[in-house]
Amino acid sequence: MYKRQFLHYALRLALFAVFSEVPYDLLFQGRVLEFSRQNILFTLLTALLVMRLLDLAAKKRNVFLFIGALLLAVVPYFLHFSYGVYGVLSVLCFFLFQKYRGIDAIAFSALTYGRYLYDGNFTQLYAIAASIPILLYNGKRGAVSLKYFFYIIYPAHLLVLYAIHYILANHLLPF
């Protein structure tokens, strides 16, 4: 990814991460702004930055960039981003093994199973099924017309879920 493309992508992720935080906090914390948990877009932004640092570290053979990538990868743990370090490592499984189709899915499955062994969250094991469409990806860029749809759908679905929760919790239905 070229420097300009990377910067635009990182800025878009950052903008929508901030924009999505209010709907996320409303749904999960019941407040407009609550800093005890952050949405997944912050995790994805961190993963993007880690990938960039790893790329630069490999190209420049710079151990300090590599160490910086490792340190950045644990930031989601301390800032309470959704999925934490596991979220960053999940993205890295597919990034680091992108030339080895199938190995990426095995790495992701092993990581996910390891998380299950660590915290006992059985439902996270269903994430392994996400490997299937990723393995079927043909490597071609999707429709540009849908570019912002996927950014907008995330905060929009959070607002819809919050509205449903609010209506049900406050008994606002006439029946």
PLM-predicted stretches and their roles:
Residues 3-175:
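Alpha-helical transmembrane segments and their immediate juxtamembrane cytosolic regions
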